[in-house]
Every structure is written in C-alpha cells, then in structure tokens.
Amino acid sequence: MIDLDTVKSHLRVDGDEDDALIQAYTDAAFSTFEQWTNRKLIAEGEPLPEPAGNSIVITKAICQGALLLIGHWFMGREAVVTGTIATEMPMATQALWGPHRWVNL
C-alpha cells in the first residue's frame, strides 16, 4: 500500500540491509490500522466488496499515519527504551486514523 522506497525515504534510509525489517513494519502498520479502526483497507483502484461493510479505500492520511508509526517503531526497536516515556501509538497517528475508526457499542 506504500512502496518500500517511499518508506525508506521517510526513514532516511539509503541502504538495503534493513529492507526486510522496514517491510515488516509497513505490513504491521497497516494491520494495526485495521485492528485499531475495525476497518478493512482496500487499495486505491481495487473494487469494494459487496456489501462494502467496514471497508475503506486507503487515503493519504492513512498512509501518513502509517509512515509515522513505522518511523516510531524503526527508531525504537525494543519494547522498552531507557530514558524515554513509554507510549502506545504516536498521537499524530491517532489523529490521522481516528476519523476512520469504527467503535463497536
């Protein structure tokens, strides 16, 4: 949904030694979006399923939120980083993804 070169540019990574890790973070970020929002991502140009239900076509805001989350994970690769404040998800990612979130009542 975001090509590897775009993610690497966002992370300011030139080499290819971290490509597998970056791709794993990218896949995990979109999976996190789907779990957090209770929505199913559909690539642009891909037909919506019938019925559309909780499906959503990926937007620039969704991609930007994913890039921020990928950067967060890339910079802090361990579960706990000494000398920092623990956070669940970057606030900017929540702000970008929040409008798309479906909450089950």
Locate each region found by the language model.
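Divalent metal-cofactor coordination and adjacent catalytic microenvironments
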Residues: M1-L105
